[in-house]
């Protein structure tokens, strides 16, 4: 068992433009090599582009996209005897949100296109409409949990 204490989580402050903690979390996930201003500019531009294309409030589209990508259940490997079982576990809210943001950024980067602004805005709009790679990843995670439901009694 680990002797280390758990890391104290620092509170995430709301971003100045949208006054949303979720936007700050997304900025931090987008950031590469400490370039927060660049990540912020990309995210704000993507949200503006979402507003231009959909005509809806960009924060609403963003929140809906994150909600649609958030997994409710996932599988974790558990070793019992000599076998490793994929045990379905409920996902805590903070982890679910973190996974959703990670998947949105990951699949935005994989998209074909010229600029990150375009790729991110397209992924956000797709996720808000319950399509897109990030939503597919959540469904795949849920399918894995459903397939391994027989091992739920190994939960820890």
UniProtKB/Swiss-Prot annotation:
GO terms for molecular function: mRNA binding; rRNA binding; structural constituent of ribosome; tRNA binding. The keyword Lyase does not apply. One of its GO terms (cellular component) is cytosolic small ribosomal subunit. Keywords: Ribonucleoprotein, Ribosomal protein, RNA-binding, rRNA-binding, tRNA-binding. One of its GO terms (biological process) is translation. InterPro entries: Ribosomal_uS7, Ribosomal_uS7_bac/org-type, Ribosomal_uS7_CS, Ribosomal_uS7_dom, Ribosomal_uS7_dom_sf. The keyword Disulfide bond does not apply. Part of the 30S ribosomal subunit. Contacts proteins S9 and S11. Belongs to the universal ribosomal protein uS7 family. PANTHER family: RIBOSOMAL PROTEIN S7. One of the primary rRNA binding proteins, it binds directly to 16S rRNA where it nucleates assembly of the head domain of the 30S subunit. Is located at the subunit interface close to the decoding center, probably blocks exit of the E-site tRNA. This is Small ribosomal subunit protein uS7. It comes from Gloeobacter violaceus (strain ATCC 29082 / PCC 7421). The gene is rpsG.
